Amino acid sequence: DRTASDSAALDSTIELLVRTKRSLPMAKLMTIPEAFAHRRDFPKKLKDLYTYANAVMESWDGPAAICGCHDQWAIAGMDRNGLRPLRYTLTNDFLIAGSETGMVEIDEAEILERGRVGPGQMIAVNFKEGKFYKDKEIKNKLSQSRPFGEWIKKIKHIDKLVQSVDEEFRDIQTSDLRRRMTSFGWTSEDMEIILHPMIASQKEAVGSMGDDTPIAVLSDNYRGLHHFFRQNFSQVTNPPIDSLRERVVMSLRTRIGNLSNILDEDQSQCDHLQLNSPVLSINQFKTLRQYMKDKVKIIDTTMDIQQENYHFKKELDRINKEAEEAVRSGYVHIILTDKSLSKSRVALPMILVTSSVHHYLIKKRLRTFISLNVQSAECLDVHYFAVLIGVGATSINAYMAQQAIAERHKKKLFGQLTYEECVERYIQSVNNGLLKIMSKMGISVVSSYRGGCNFEAIGLSRNLMSEYFPSMSSKISGMGLKGLEQKSLFAHNKAYSDDVINLPIGGFYRYRKDGEKHSFEGTSIHILQTAVGTNNYSLYKK
């Protein structure tokens, strides 16, 4: 039921699991597991159990304190962050669980134990055994119910598969790289203010608050599609997370492969590749491609502008149909790539393509059968990665950003850092940024953020939103698909018709004479100061 609440969806999922012979404690553990990835004090058997549970299905983040009863079990459990109160009272005859200790009047002489259920924990009663289980006891019981340690050996880790440093793209011609960058709207400002600090400090660049530039739809310059989206933040129910001090409960681990039947319980559910992060280097993406073998369908996301009657709508329909046919033909992975970009082929905005394919496959009820991997030249800053993941991307390779790093490294702009270290620091800075963005929504794991569309569009038409971004809202309507096409073609033709020696200056973050317009540019401020100093009203009006 699409109109049902999150709580109703969770209830329905747990009900489905218990009706297929899984115990209620196991159903709770699979749907709302404890944070374990960064904890060194976790017993191996419990780690094996949670690793298996994460391989079977994506987890709920909460906040939630749940109580349930089915068959011979009654349970009470908490979400991984412990963001709801849950206390219990055990008597000679009863177990009472709820948000407060004193909900029910009980004779103190009857009370055996009082306590609280912590983050990710649960308590349980088995009616058949007549036994009360604390958190460690019930989880030890579950961890011994199946050979989970043997099953999870089928999970492959990408770091163990990477064998050598990939030299691909390292020697790309500077002129060709400049044209590609210009066609996507990159500027020298992006290189100096965005990319360089990410490698130098392993963090996003820090800037002052406020934005006095036009919103993307009103700008005269080409702005990437990610500029049309604003990140949502938690309000009322979901408290934000501190991504620095509460890192232990957060994870970017990503599984690559078909989601198996969640109703099964065997080792086949662990046959997939695990990534430590959805952000991949060129070398890691090449390794991923080798792992996929013949189970991958590569879809070109560029458009031939030499053919007659070309337009974005036609290309998006083609891409969607190719994706559907791939799933129905038994492919397990899809790669969306714009590597075919050339003078005669313009790249469609990757955010638009990814969202289109993701939602199209959801409508056809095929999305869970495939991983949606993106190889994008447009991707540079953390916000772009966040939007791509938010509209459904499983993994992302920003290959042109890595080419830009290689070019700057040749010029010795990163000091004593090796090229490999620069790439690692760039990916780490993106990872840190993704955790920060997720934390603003109170989301702990990237699988909960993926496809969640936690953004609000500004300046995109409602027809465009309803067709390609149906899970998002656009409070201010504006540019449609035709407008995006015209902007992309203008930037592309400009890049490939002119002799591009240097990137455009930009002027988005700092005012430049030939760059983006600013409300508070130098000339206006100078006139204002002069008008105030000379008490000149006519100059003030100017």
Predicted regions mapped to residue ranges:
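Short, ordered loop/turn segments at secondary-structure junctions
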Residues: 128, 339-341, 377, 393, ...
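Catalytic cores of alpha/beta
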Residues: 378-392
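Short beta-alpha connecting loops at secondary-structure transitions
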Residues: 1-2, 104-109, 369-374, 403-424, ...
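Conserved catalytic micro-motifs used in adenylation/nucleotidyl-transfer and phosphoryl/amide-
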Residues: 58-96
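N-terminus-centric sequence/structural signature that marks the extreme N-terminus
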Residues: 1-19, 78-82, 89
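Conserved, mostly hydrophobic/aromatic
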Residues: 123, 338, 388, 445
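Flexible, glycine-rich loop/tail regions that form catalytic "lids" or insertion modules at the edges
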Residues: 17-64, 68-72, 99-103, 131-313, ...
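Alpha-helix-loop-beta-strand connector modules within alpha/beta enzyme cores
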Residues: 346-372, 425-432, 436
